């Protein structure tokens, strides 16, 4: 099945997400020397990068040339001093939506936690305050509303793929 080209990102059901980022925190824990909780000001004060990519979904659509801006996950891993036994990061969002990535993939320069989409602040329907983005990823790996990164030595597939496939299969 070919992909339909869309001009903008579609939106789906939005769970009870954070709209007030003043008290919101992103936590990093697990196999790290220095667990951290960062607010949006902390995150946006870190060096930022832009990642431009086509966004393709299993549902059969593509949005060409999307530009994300955010902080590299590798930058955050450096801040917390990852323990040598850590092999995977699990990104956590509301409603038990999780996605695991290898530390190797997290260290890629195009794996970021985005807070802007196409030069505008990320809106809630697109994953604000933070969305996991990695060039070439499957659409379900682009986890919206990320509030935690947990480092572990065990592979964690996460729930993202199954939730996405269930949504596609539902009429």
What kind of feature is each model-predicted range?
Residues 15-68:
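A glycine-rich, hydrophobic loop/mini-helix early in the fold
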Residues 1-26, 32, 79-171:
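Extended, aromatic/histidine-rich regions of cofactor-dependent oxidoreductases associated
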